[in-house]
């Protein structure tokens, strides 16, 4: 029996995927798995029993990845599960910024008691006029699950789309419209585009990537959109640019006091993935990843360990080992099982950065005392068994 703990409310449609071998617990110290959305885990004590954390969403900056990796805890996210919800809000952001829809709505509300509002609207509507996005240049920084959907939707709306992503995968590239101009120079996007939207993960290398230097290259008429992570855009630089009309507008899903007090900032209360469909998709995906890991040892969409899949074990026992990526580890594992007289039927070893992951299917069952000898090998972080 496996136990799971939810740090945030998780969509019931996802939790229903847990079968009778799973039970919900209110105590994290009893949990084999944790499901989380936005709860900050950095100051939490992670119990020894905990094997896996499933993030029902894409960003993992609320999870202590270093601590998890050292404790042998696999961390999964759900890339693409909320992509359509975010894409739709980005398109809405483009439209809100191109025409003063927000200002027009506020004006109507201010005149709601005026019996002449219908006639007055015809006189006042000019102040809320704007332009169309068709034919305008949209620059997309980051062509992952969300960036690709935004690019393809913008092409369908008649925009001239530029994409920048030096790390785009082959799989992602196949999904991208052939009408997207792929640039290898992000500065081309800063210089040429009328709208710029950012869709990259928050890392040390991307924090503040849209700052004073990038803004200096942009057109004064540019609209910058950020539905990825707040700190990707330098707060001080963007506020100064808005105050001095160095850029036209900033549309963001991450409210701050400074931005909320600027008329040329359109600030949304983090609604990007706040759709029922997104929450359901993320929950279902996270639960399935957790199940496959706990029951079969397979890793998909881990952010701290390498992906690895050997399907369902058809031999006597499966052993999985999380270890440091140092020389001779695989030799030590195979030698140890050989010394124990246990035959290895199948084996996969993959690495990612400082860590490695081994899946071994055995011809006969190893008892706990024999497994302890594997755990005792220097460099081993966690050993799990399943039948």
Question: PLM features: residue spans?
Answer:
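Glycine-rich Rossmann-fold phosphate-binding loop(s) that bind the pyrophosphate
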Residues: 143-144
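Oxidoreductase and adenylate-handling cofactor-binding alpha/beta cores
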Residues: 87-106, 152-159, 285-298, 334-338
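N-terminal Rossmann-fold NAD(P) dinucleotide-binding loop
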Residues: 147-148
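Rossmann-like adenosine-cofactor binding region
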Residues: 39-44, 166-258, 274
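An N-terminal-biased, well-structured beta-alpha scaffold segment characteristic
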Residues: 1-78, 211-213, 217, 223, ...
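Phosphate-binding beta-alpha-beta segment of Rossmann-like dinucleotide-binding domains, i.e.
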Residues: 79-137, 301-303
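Rossmann-like dinucleotide-binding domain for NAD(H)/NADP(H)
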Residues: 212, 220-313, 357, 361, ...
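A conserved regulatory-domain signal marking ACT and ACT-like small-molecule sensing domains
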Residues: 304-387
